Amino acid sequence: MTTQLDALKQMTVVVADTGDIEAMKLYKPQDATTNPSLILSASALPQYVSLIDDAVAYAKAKSSDKAQQLIDAEDKLAVNIGLEILKLVPGRISTEVDARLSYDIQGTIEKARKIIALYNEAGVANDRILIKVASTWQGIRAAEVLEKEGINCNLTLLFSQAQARACAEAGVYLISPFVGRILDWYKANSDKQEYAPAEDPGVISVTQIYNYYKQYGYKTVVMGASFRNIGEITELAGCDRLTIAPPLLKQLQENEAPLARKLEYKGEVQTRPAPMTEAEFYWEHNADPMAVEKLAEGIRKFAADIEKLEAMLAAKL
């Protein structure tokens, strides 16, 4: 019998949402995504000690200034983990820009160039890397510049149709619209606690974004992210890509129920609307309280995990 994971791989590129190298070996994803929270949890694993030590040695050799050493060690550690993962996936690794730069266009551009340079120095070409950037207006503008330089971006923490539209209009390579965190918000802010997969507000959001992109012929890849259960995943079968954490990959691998394609746009490609202005972006994005709260919360959480990572590295510098 075919497992649901194998069936899903026939219609969707499956990506592992983890920094755990053992999981890569087990589930054989095409790509992998990391973020500050995943780097933090991965850095606690014993097999990563040498990667941390290497990042610390690199930072000490590069600068005598403690603050600069911390920044350099943090960037090098993220790349070191990415390099290990790239030995196991045939496709791309997503490495995230410091979330504290989420509202800083130039800062994001410079950090992305630095991450790319570290990968290039290790012999990895740009076409195996995605730079993850939060889907703020500033992050989207930074990604627009980076894409023109041949640096492909993964726009993350995406919760609103406004964010999705602005990303497509900026020509970004890939977006990561979140599913589970949208469901979390609706559960926390209403009496309804149970949702059938087709009624899940996160599933509905990604479905709408997928159809919008195909309707207007945008090439930006839609990669659903942040899943709470396999029902959300199977309801998005056919999405360009889905990034899935190891526990859910395990469930899909152990499940042999038939899997039908759910996302497929068969209509005509239509004439695109004029690009959104900054004012239109903020008006539309801020009209959705879920998107506003979840974007801000996501940035805060990633920033907090970066600070924990820095504390761990600072103790070694």
Swiss-Prot record:
What lineage is on file? Bacteria, Pseudomonadati, Pseudomonadota, Gammaproteobacteria, Pasteurellales
* MF term (GO), any: transaldolase activity
Q: Pfam families given for it?
A: TAL_FSA
Mind listing the GO biological process terms from this record?
A: carbohydrate metabolic process; pentose-phosphate shunt
Q: What's the name of the protein?
A: Transaldolase
Q: Which EC numbers characterise this protein's activity in its record? A: 2.2.1.2
Q: Which UniProt keywords apply?
A: Cytoplasm, Pentose shunt, Schiff base, Transferase
The protein's assembly and partners? Homodimer.
Give yes or no: UniProt keyword Transferase.
yes
Reaction equation(s) it catalyzes: D-sedoheptulose 7-phosphate + D-glyceraldehyde 3-phosphate = D-erythrose 4-phosphate + beta-D-fructose 6-phosphate
Q: Where is the active site?
A: K132 (schiff-base intermediate with substrate)
Query: Record's InterPro entries?
Result: Aldolase_TIM, TAL/FSA, Transaldolase_1, Transaldolase_AS
Where does this protein reside within or beyond the cell? Cytoplasm
Broad class of enzyme this protein falls into: transferase
- Per the record, the domain of life is Bacteria
